[in-house]
């Protein structure tokens, strides 16, 4: 029987009911807004032009000492659009854009939108076969390549089969010297008109605007088709429902603009509100609060790893009385949620869930803690066997839905409102669809994520959910399921650890997968194996304790700060493939020891006793 509430608890509950009700009333009009039909004439470019007409003289962007108003930004964008059109780019053409975060990235991408062309937003850290693959899988007619990343591009330039006139070099902050085999795009852009293009008004919501690529942590990146409708479906709620953004806000934007969170959610919120942004090339934990104070940023677009990096920094004067009020992003884990919110006095943490290619979206619109929020999509959670890595079915072959509080594989129904636009590769698109799930003929998008419904208290009767794990990021050891995220959260709290990347590895003559963690240590730390061993014993059950520990000088992440596991999993504890220190917890041992060649051979022989 539940204990009766005391007076203080009753008052807190009443305050929460009042707060949630006010929040709900405030966002109801925007929740009711439906995405445009695919035939409606609306696009990123037309939304930009509407914002410019309303906020023309207001500041739009601050970048490395340079400031532009909305009107000035639009004029530069129009000049780029006229220049690209003169070079033969037309509606439906794909153009690869490879640059760091900077003003020219935005003006060229929006210039392509003005024409009705497709901008392929390519990870600027890629090189070699992955870079070549992304350019070619997008069907790129031209490439806009920044001076700062041209060396990587030059290495694969001969394999692209493009004429010199199709390689447009974009200077970075100075005139520079255009390399042989390309043309200097900015050399004569100023000669073109600053007027809007007349054809922009004819671009439809269902037209493809962008290609945004998957991270490629387990293989070659896939190009997700982002229509104008899909961009609107992400950008509008980010600003209106999530951040409650207004023209007087200033955003801190340091996420890569080639990624959906930065370009769809961040820029979408800015365009729909008329707010300004402080744009940074890359995130810096040590300079974040100095920037926030100098530029008085009120909103921040995050991924969870950035929040963890900020918490790992020593307390500084600049974080005190900081101007940040609201944050929007994904991947903020429950173990640091309240610490992040409390230490930095954040009023509103709006976690969201979604993917560039998917049709499922969640948003924490009611500002609840430790949740990715609610959804308007039709979703179900079905049983998933993490050991066999497959969906569980009943005797009739039907999927089994899980109960509240139980993790399940998240599926989103594909219908007219919540479309699945897929990838450029039709086979890859079909592989993400499950059919005949509830009734014959239905189709559902397989997110590949384990999610569970949770209790968040009073929430207007709306179901709320929490991210649990990525399928494949859960493994089985000692007949128990081990969540890499849960173990990682616990290890991240260790005094030595900057970031823990947990994964499962095969061990000869052992059932399941043994846990392994790759640790990057805090600055100035030398790995204290005794302290870490004691911490693991104290905080993790035996089956969840990593068997192997690898010490890395720097965490392995993608350009969008996602932990890279594929190569680490492949290298595992194999001494010939790893130059860094590896430690092992022997069976029935109570402390980690350095893995030497003799014990390594014992493991390979299957006689170590695991």
Model-derived regions: residue spans:
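Gly/Ser/Thr-rich phosphate-binding loop
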Residues: 187, 272, 294-302, 311-385, ...
């Amino acid at each position: 029987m539940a204990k009766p509430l005391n007076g203080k608890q009753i008052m807190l509950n009443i305050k929460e009911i009042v707060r949630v009700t006010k929040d709900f009333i405030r966002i109801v009009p925007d929740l009711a807004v439906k995405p445009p039909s695919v035939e409606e004439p609306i696009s990123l470019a037309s939304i930009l032009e509407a914002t410019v007409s309303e906020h023309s003289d207001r500041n739009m962007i601050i970048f490395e000492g340079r400031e532009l108003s909305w009107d000035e930004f639009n004029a530069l964008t129009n000049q780029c659009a006229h220049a690209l059109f003169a070079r033969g780019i037309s509606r439906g053409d794909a153009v690869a854009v490879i640059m760091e975060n900077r003003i020219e990235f935005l003006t060229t991408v929006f210039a392509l939108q003005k024409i009705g062309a497709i901008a392929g937003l390519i990870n600027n850290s890629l090189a070699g076969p992955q870079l070549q693959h992304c350019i070619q899988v997008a069907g790129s007619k031209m490439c806009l390549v920044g001076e700062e990343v041209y060396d990587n591009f030059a290495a694969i330039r001969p394999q692209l089969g493009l004429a010199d006139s199709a390689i447009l070099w974009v200077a970075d902050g100075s005139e520079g010297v255009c390399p042989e085999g390309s043309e200097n795009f900015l050399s004569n852009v100023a000669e073109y008109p600053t007027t809007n293009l007349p054809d922009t008004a004819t671009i439809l919501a269902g037209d493809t605007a962008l290609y945004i690529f998957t991270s490629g942590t387990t293989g070659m990146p896939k190009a997700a088709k982002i229509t104008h409708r899909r961009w609107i479906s992400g950008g509008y709620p980010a600003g209106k429902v999530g951040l409650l953004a207004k023209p007087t806000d200033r955003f801190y934007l340091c996420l890569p603009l080639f990624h959906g969170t930065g370009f769809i959610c961040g820029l979408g919120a800015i365009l729909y509100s008329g707010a300004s942004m402080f744009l940074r090339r890359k995130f810096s934990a040590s300079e974040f609060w100095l920037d926030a104070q100098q530029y008085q940023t009120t909103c921040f677009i995050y991924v969870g790893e950035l929040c963890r990096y900020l918490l790992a920094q020593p307390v500084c004067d600049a974080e005190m009385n900081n101007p940040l009020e609201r944050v929007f992003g994904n991947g903020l884990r429950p173990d640091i949620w309240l610490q992040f919110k409390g230490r930095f006095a954040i009023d509103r943490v709006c976690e969201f869930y979604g993917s560039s290619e998917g049709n499922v979206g969640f948003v924490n619109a009611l500002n609840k803690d430790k949740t990715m929020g609610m959804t308007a999509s039709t979703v179900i959670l079905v049983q998933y066997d993490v050991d066999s890595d497959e969906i569980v079915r009943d005797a009739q072959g039907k999927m089994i839905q899980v109960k509240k509080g139980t993790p399940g594989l998240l599926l989103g129904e594909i219908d007219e409102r919540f479309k699945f636009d897929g990838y450029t590769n039709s086979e890859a698109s079909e592989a993400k669809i499950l059919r005949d799930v509830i009734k014959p003929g239905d189709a559902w998008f397989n997110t590949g994520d384990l999610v569970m419904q949770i209790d968040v208290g009073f929430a207007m009767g709306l179901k709320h959910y929490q991210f649990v794990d990525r399928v494949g990021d859960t493994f089985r050891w000692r007949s128990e399921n081990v969540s890499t995220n849960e173990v990682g959260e616990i290890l991240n709290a260790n005094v030595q650890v900057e970031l823990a990347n947990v994964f499962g590895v095969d061990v000869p003559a052992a059932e399941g997968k043994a846990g392994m963690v790759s640790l990057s240590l805090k600055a100035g730390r030398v790995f204290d194996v005794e302290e870490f061993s004691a911490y693991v014993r104290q905080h993790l059950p035996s089956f969840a304790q990593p068997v192997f520990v690898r010490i890395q000088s720097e965490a392995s992440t993608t350009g969008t700060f996602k932990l890279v596991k594929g190569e680490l999993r492949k290298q595992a504890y194999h001494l010939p493939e790893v130059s860094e220190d590896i430690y092992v917890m022997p069976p029935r041992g109570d402390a980690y020891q350095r893995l030497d060649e003799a014990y390594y051979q014992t493991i390979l022989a299957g006689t170590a006793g695991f």
